């Protein structure tokens, strides 16, 4: 039987104090974060506009942490080389804009030393990403959006857990990430469905004790894995 994918807690830096990004990143790592989740939006694929490669490059000078980059952009291939040079660790693109070129995209991401992942919006059937996980040159992570991508602080969509369950049943050792509305009140549902990578923004950064939230998220994932 394949080993369970390790629990990974990834604070969403979109919810951090951008004026003190390096200090916020350091604080999250000290409090137990495994990854730092970086949302890159172009104002086209989603209405919001956030950061790009220059911010990743600046942050990389101050941290050795795994920078988990989620590309909510129309042309992800344009970002591969700049983000690789900037020091990105993971590069997760959206299937909705990559249906015709995902093989080439995965190849270029790996060639630049980054870890490829694929994400899907709430309205996209989970079956669309199966070929990318099963390919000869596969993605190594699937990100299931549990809100409509673009803005933080939205309400968690529990119906998306059907996608997580389907993925975990087919791929026992795959990194399955969930993003949107995750916190102490919703983590158990996500963890029991099979998610092992947890992105959380406002529930961590808005907490009086962010380290306790990170610890609670991890315990929920590990507890669910021990039951299964």
From Swiss-Prot:
* Pathway field: Carbohydrate degradation; pentose phosphate pathway; D-xylulose 5-phosphate from D-ribulose 5-phosphate (non-oxidative stage): step 1/1
What EC number(s) are associated with this protein in UniProt?
5.1.3.1
Domain of life (superkingdom)? Eukaryota
Task: List positions binding substrate.
Answer: 12, 70, 150-153, 179-181, 201-202
Residues that bind a divalent metal cation: 37, 39, 70, 179
| Annotated active site | 39, 179
GO biological process terms held by the UniProt record? carbohydrate metabolic process; pentose-phosphate shunt, non-oxidative branch
Found, by tissue, as follows: Predominantly accumulates in roots and seedlings.
Q: What cofactor does this chain's UniProt record say it requires?
A: Co(2+); Fe(2+); Mn(2+); Zn(2+)
CDD domains cross-referenced by the UniProt entry: RPE
One GO CC term on file: cytosol
GO MF annotation, one: metal ion binding
Task: Give the reactions, separated by semicolons, that this protein catalyses.
Answer: D-ribulose 5-phosphate = D-xylulose 5-phosphate
Localization, per the record, is:
Cytoplasm
Report the cofactor remark: Binds 1 divalent metal cation per subunit. Active with Co(2+), Fe(2+), Mn(2+) and Zn(2+).
Q: Name one Pfam family in it.
A: Ribul_P_3_epim
Positions the record marks as coiled coil are none
Enumerate the HAMAP family for this protein: RPE
Oligomeric state and interaction partners are given as: Homodimer.
Role description: Catalyzes the reversible epimerization of D-ribulose 5-phosphate to D-xylulose 5-phosphate.
> Which protein family is it in?
Belongs to the ribulose-phosphate 3-epimerase family.
- PANTHER family per the UniProt record, alphabetical: RIBULOSE-5-PHOSPHATE-3-EPIMERASE
Its recorded name reads Ribulose-phosphate 3-epimerase, cytoplasmic isoform
